[in-house]
């Protein structure tokens, strides 16, 4: 920011316990700037303004046919073109019933509502785009308006996708939902002994076959607009000039090798200036799920 004419003495950086917690803190004005998924931004957009949208490296697979994602031969790679959206995937776990669901999908059979309702689902908080909102919209589009809240056996998870994959590995649930392709991030830990950790610190899950064979995609959602960099409307610091400088600053930083390394934790590879209207679709998704 100093190169753009603004001297900032001190920045306090914290890690939110959840996306909702970050959104609530920004709404209250106790956080000035934060990174929020599109769905969380839409939920808090009365009190928060978007300034940037992330771009990411796309995946090698963007098929809407779930069977195309399954098996070692279809293992997803992070080598696609730059994209402004991602998808959520609905995965059948290696539980006995999860395997039944996967076998039907891989044979080209469409799952019925009864098939899905019999399963035990693990889902994220209701503000999570990939972990709740878009999977619920997928159900609505394919099963006569039914959604996650209509399912008989749903296990909400407050502690993130790692917990969902650990439940899957333990065969405690039959279906989990996650961003595409979450299997990349848990591939190394999936087959490690449970008393070991992978190089990123993820605990081993003790499975004996690869995650690509055991975690089968049974549903693919519509595209989800990428994460935001957003600012609190309650903050005392922002003027249009400072916002413009922040936008340029983040775009410049991520354009460097050092910046790319910093933002790799989010899988962000670039930023583009954004407006609130870009997330009208995310608001519509929230409304559809809430009704």
Task: State the predicted function of each range.
Residues 117-237:
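Pocket-lining segment of extracytoplasmic ligand-binding domains
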Residues 55-129:
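A conserved helix-loop-strand patch within extracytoplasmic ligand-binding domains
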